[in-house]
């Protein structure tokens, strides 16, 4: 949502549909979902007069966000949500590695009182050594892993109990077999699964995630994006959603297929997703 009230309204709608776990973002990651700096300023101003820094005259096109203004707005968002909705609903927030490690540590400490289900991706993979300091200063549960590509990234975090949820992208780490090994290793160390399931994952990937969920005693939660009619038309066997739970069918294998003839009706469109063109107020390119 664009402000606390809009986020609250959207959560209430999800609660009426039966959802018990909701990821809460004000704007997109880092609070930005547009390259219109005036609109960003207006959105943040709604969050109790938080103003982003000004940009230079000849700013480069991109999705602008102010990490400092964002970090100030997040605790105020969850203060509003807990006051209005209480503690019977579980909240998640995704930092998307868009702040400095020190800011992430401070954010995790500040959010403790709001009892998040977890804080997602507080630091980038190249900054995972900072998680030790974060863990020493905050009890906010941490989820990480969607950008990991090899065992040397996730193993030390699990060995040293620096994360609570592992959320790798299954195909990126090698597929179902490596992911199952990771799930078992995580189970031995008290870490639960939360496989990456963004809106751009295929229904085949969604089914792979869910079969891993069903076979893992340490299942934590599954990120899930609702599927439109076109996807259900092209991929017969898509999971069904009912009151916040996702259901697989009992067909062989992953239980899903692809109709290539129907897929041909939906040609790919080129272009760069605008949200990946992230920039800080002075125009510096940032990770998406």
Task: Map each language-model feature to its residues.
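Shared catalytic-loop signature of beta/alpha-barrel
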Residues: 109, 115-118, 124-252
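Extended hydrophobic packing segments that form well-structured cores
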Residues: 254-288
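Metal-dependent enolase-superfamily TIM-barrel catalytic cores that perform enediolate-based chemistry
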Residues: 1-132
């Amino acid at each position: 949502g664009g402000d606390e009230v809009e986020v609250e309204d959207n959560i209430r709608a999800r609660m009426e549909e039966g959802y018990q776990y909701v990821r809460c973002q004000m704007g997109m990651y880092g609070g930005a979902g547009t390259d219109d700096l005036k609109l960003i300023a207006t959105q943040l101003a709604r969050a109790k007069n938080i103003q982003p820094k000004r940009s230079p005259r000849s700013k480069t096109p991109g999705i602008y966000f102010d990490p400092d203004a964002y970090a100030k707005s997040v605790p105020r968002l969850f203060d509003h949500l807990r006051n209005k909705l209480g503690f019977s609903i579980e909240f998640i927030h995704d930092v998307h590695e868009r702040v400095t490690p020190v800011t992430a540590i401070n954010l995790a400490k500040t959010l403790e009182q709001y009892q998040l289900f977890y804080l997602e991706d507080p630091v980038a993979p190249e900054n995972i050594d900072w998680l030790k300091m974060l863990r020493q200063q905050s009890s906010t549960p941490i989820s990480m892993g969607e950008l990991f590509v090899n065992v040397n990234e996730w193993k030390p975090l699990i060995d040293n109990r620096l994360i609570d949820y592992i959320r790798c992208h299954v195909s990126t780490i090698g597929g179902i077999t490596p992911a199952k090994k990771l799930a078992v290793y995580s189970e031995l160390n008290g870490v639960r699964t939360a496989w990456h399931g963004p809106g751009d994952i295929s229904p085949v990937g969604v089914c792979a995630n869910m079969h891993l969920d069903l076979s893992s005693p340490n299942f934590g939660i599954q990120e899930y994006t609702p599927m439109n009619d076109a996807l259900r038309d092209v991929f017969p066997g898509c999971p069904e959603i009912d009151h916040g739970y996702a259901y697989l069918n009992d067909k062989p294998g992953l239980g899903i297929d692809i109709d290539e003839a129907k897929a041909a009706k939906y040609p790919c469109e080129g272009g760069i997703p605008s949200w990946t063109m992230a920039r800080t107020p002075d125009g510096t390119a940032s990770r998406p």
